[in-house]
Amino acid sequence: MATPLLLVVNAILIMAITACGGGGGNGGIQLIMVNNCGESVWPGLLGTAGHPTPQSGGFHLGAGEEAALEVPAGWSGRVWPRRGCSFDSRGRGSCATGDCGGVLRCNGAAGATPATVVEMTLGTSASAMHFYDVSLVDGFNAPVSMAAVGGGVGCGTAACGADVNVCCPSALEVRDREGRVAGCRSACRAMGGDRYCCTGDYASPSACRPTIFSHLFKAICPRAYSYAYDDATSLNRCHAKRYLITFCPPQPS
């Protein structure tokens, strides 16, 4: 987790970017990614619904580092943390969680589950509202949050700030080579079936209700999607030019 000094440095960086008007030009939206984890994270990125994938789909973000990128207005996509990665000079390797085919730059490939996912559909000049959330529908592998920089109109924070791995049921655990819990699968990913995945006869909000596992995820991370139809308390709406995505966000004291 972050040290007090690191949090101060991050705050100064964000204020400087905001004051100087960096990013968000030409109608684009700036995404600032901050790694407050005590180890490296390799963010994975994927444009959805035909939208481009920025940064060729992935990059390395060391402990305490920040990166800023711009996506166009109307962009739709997802961001997720990859952890426990090792890549050679050609960008080939693997990650313990969130892997996208054994490459550094995912280039249009989605991440393997379990992974905590930030999802967003950004507005345009014709429809300015942005929608975003943090989802555990694909499971959990790291705490993540997304919030507008400097606030905004009707903005909230999407987050799963707790370490779900600590209390992951054994049936959902994914362990690394050292035997440590590296991720927590969703019930859909672990057990399958229409009831857990909200598919087939359960493919509607009225038919697909939260399971005991969804209730557990929601109790730990009340501001994140715990299952497919968890919109009421998980989907955020905002109109801002810059957003901060934080891996391992600081916990309230």
From Swiss-Prot:
Gene Ontology biological process: defense response
Matches recorded under InterPro entries: Osmotin/thaumatin-like_sf, Thaumatin, Thaumatin_CS
Top-rank taxon, per record: Eukaryota
Pfam families to which the protein is assigned, alphabetical: Thaumatin
SUPFAM superfamilies: Osmotin, thaumatin-like protein
Keywords for this protein: Disulfide bond, Signal
Annotated disulfide bonds: C37-C248, C85-C95, C100-C106, C155-C238, C160-C221, C168-C184, C188-C197, C198-C208
Signal peptide span: 1-19
Family listed: Belongs to the thaumatin family.
Protein name listed in UniProt: Thaumatin-like protein
Organism: Oryza sativa subsp. japonica (Rice)
